[in-house]
């Protein structure tokens, strides 16, 4: 995949070359999208809209730390949707990981989550965030146990993941209507990179075959159900709904 690769660390250790080789990235000086190594983290920038700033994954500080400490925890809609109850903490495959926010929420309340991400740039951002998270004295211990990244296409990986999870979580890219500055900023940068998930409808059936209990699909409230398969079961919040579909139980 072609992208502009930039190093602002001031180091001469060849980290950029290692990054490119690991994720199959090719430097393109004229690409409007840039993957930038800064002294703090790896970030994605839209060079023709510098005011949007950089997008990076941070499990330790910022909004994620606030959500972990002061958010709803088990009461969050995504936690309710995957079925967390009492001692039941399902094993989850997040097949459209993105920046890992919902996966992190589930991990922070006790679920083991395997994140799938097919875009190599997004996977590199996630990996960078995980590396810093794993090294953190506060959250590193449980984060290493509960949150992992698999760089693979969901369409192929969903057919051969083992062991099978109890829940598959899907949050395909869908054009956002929200006017919030953060969503607009992130979505503009993100959609410039990955575009809409045109093959997202093809995820529902393999997800239902893989999950032993349920599939949860996050949708904006104005979006049709994934693959036009309606379900009466959903957790509804302001602006979103989490559609719930039956999985395929394990056979003895």
Swiss-Prot record:
It is found in: Cytoplasm. InterPro entries: 16SrRNA_methylTrfase_J, SAM-dependent_MTases_sf. The keyword Methyltransferase applies. One of its GO terms (molecular function) is rRNA (guanine-N2-)-methyltransferase activity. Its EC number is 2.1.1.242. S-adenosyl-L-methionine binds at residues 101-102, 117-118, 153-154, 171. It catalyses: guanosine(1516) in 16S rRNA + S-adenosyl-L-methionine = N(2)-methylguanosine(1516) in 16S rRNA + S-adenosyl-L-homocysteine + H(+). Keywords: Cytoplasm, Methyltransferase, rRNA processing, S-adenosyl-L-methionine, Transferase. The keyword Methyltransferase applies. One of its GO terms (cellular component) is cytoplasm. HAMAP family: 16SrRNA_methyltr_J. Specifically methylates the guanosine in position 1516 of 16S rRNA. Belongs to the methyltransferase superfamily. RsmJ family. This is Ribosomal RNA small subunit methyltransferase J. It comes from Salmonella paratyphi C (strain RKS4594).
């Amino acid at each position: 995949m072609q992208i502009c690769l930039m190093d602002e660390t001031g180091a001469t250790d060849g980290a950029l070359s290692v990054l490119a080789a690991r994720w199959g990235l090719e430097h393109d000086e004229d690409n409007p999208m840039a993957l930038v190594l800064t002294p703090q983290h790896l970030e994605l920038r839209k060079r023709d809209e510098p005011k949007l700033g950089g997008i990076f994954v941070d499990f330790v500080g910022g909004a994620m730390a606030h959500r972990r400490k002061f958010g709803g925890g088990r009461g969050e809609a995504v936690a309710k949707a995957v079925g967390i109850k009492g001692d039941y903490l399902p094993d989850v495959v997040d097949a459209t990981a993105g920046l890992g926010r919902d996966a992190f929420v589930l991990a922070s309340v006790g679920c083991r989550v395997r994140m799938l991400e097919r875009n190599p740039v997004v996977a590199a951002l996630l990996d960078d965030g995980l590396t810093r998270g794993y090294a953190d004295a506060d959250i590193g211990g449980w984060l290493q146990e509960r949150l992992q990244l698999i760089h693979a296409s969901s369409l192929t990986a969903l057919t051969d993941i083992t062991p099978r999870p109890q829940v598959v979580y899907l949050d395909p890219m869908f054009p956002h209507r929200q006017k919030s500055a953060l969503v607009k900023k992130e979505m503009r940068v993100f959609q410039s990179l990955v575009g809409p998930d045109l093959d997202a409808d093809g995820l529902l059936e393999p997800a239902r075959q893989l999950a032993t209990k349920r599939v949860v699909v996050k949708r904006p409230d104005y979006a049709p159900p994934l693959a036009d398969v309606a379900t009466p079961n959903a957790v509804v919040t302001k602006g979103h709904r989490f559609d719930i579909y039956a999985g395929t139980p394990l056979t003895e």
